[in-house]
């Protein structure tokens, strides 16, 4: 078992007018990552804001991510941010993990649109693992789960703000470790009861009920 790097990208929308010159609907504004060793321990984290060249940091994205223009105006461009990311990665090749396939496709598409070489990326990062698909397989239900729902369902609660790239990467790493190491995947009992057959699709318990008795994972350091 080799090393894993769990990657989470935060993005902002690109207006239709700007897409005439930049053929992507979104643009990366933060790269977050968590590095896992061979024992699936989280040994390091990475976060870098990225200054968008075409995207617009609108109020919705600001509210969702907590990212403001002050964080981005002096941030590196994507090329420089990726150079920092590659310098942070270990020298040996790692397997990339992301909550869904969106991160890989966005990164590849944006690098292509900005004429950035994929050579260095391909040398350092091997295959990609779709953690959302792994989780859906364990749940045996074909639908798209949000990361936040998957964490609650899996009895994982970590400190930090959702939709922050580093926090989401860290939380995805916790879930990925559980998916790989638990032969019989254990759910939060309140979540499991709320979703047992016959109860329908409406959640029968409050969020407070779901959080009772959670095994708290070590949080991110301040």
Q: Which residues does each predicted region cover?
A:
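Short, flexible loop segments at boundaries between secondary-structure elements
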Residues: 122-144, 197-200
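Active-site flanking residues adjacent to catalytic metal/cofactor-binding acidic residues
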Residues: 7, 129, 167
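Short, glycine/acidic-enriched loop or turn micro-motifs at the edges of active sites
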Residues: 11-13, 133, 171
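Conserved non-catalytic scaffold segment of RNase H-like nuclease domains
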Residues: 2-109, 160
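Substrate-recognition/cap helix-loop segment adjacent to the acidic, metal-dependent catalytic center
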Residues: 102-127
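Acidic two-metal-ion nuclease catalytic site recognized across multiple nuclease folds
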Residues: 174-222
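Active-site catalytic microenvironments for nucleophilic, acid-base chemistry
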Residues: 110-114, 137, 153, 178-182
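Active-site-proximal helix-loop-helix substrate-binding element of RNase H-like nuclease domains
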Residues: 56-58, 62-65, 72, 132-169
């Amino acid at each position: 078992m080799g090393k894993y790097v769990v990657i989470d990208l935060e993005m902002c929308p690109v207006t239709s007018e700007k897409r005439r010159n930049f053929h992507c609907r979104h643009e990366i504004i933060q790269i977050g990552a968590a590095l896992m060793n061979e024992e699936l321990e989280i040994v390091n984290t990475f976060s870098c804001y990225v200054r968008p060249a075409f995207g617009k940091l609108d109020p919705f994205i600001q509210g969702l991510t907590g990212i403001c223009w002050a964080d981005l105006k002096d941030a590196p461009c994507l090329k420089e941010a990726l150079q920092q990311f590659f310098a942070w990665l270990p020298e040996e090749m790692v397997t990339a993990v992301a909550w869904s396939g969106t991160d890989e496709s966005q990164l590849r598409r944006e690098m292509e649109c900005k004429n950035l070489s994929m050579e260095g990326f391909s040398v350092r990062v091997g295959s990609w693992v779709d953690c959302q698909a792994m989780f859906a397989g364990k749940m045996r239900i074909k639908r798209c789960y949000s990361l936040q729902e998957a964490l609650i369902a899996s009895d994982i609660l970590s400190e930090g703000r959702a939709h922050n790239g580093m926090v989401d990467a860290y939380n995805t790493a916790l879930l990925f470790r559980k998916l790989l190491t638990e032969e019989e995947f254990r759910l939060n009992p309140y979540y499991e009861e709320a979703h047992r057959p016959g109860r329908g699709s409406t959640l029968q318990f409050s969020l407070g009920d779901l959080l009772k008795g959670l095994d708290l994972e070590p949080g991110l350091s301040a």
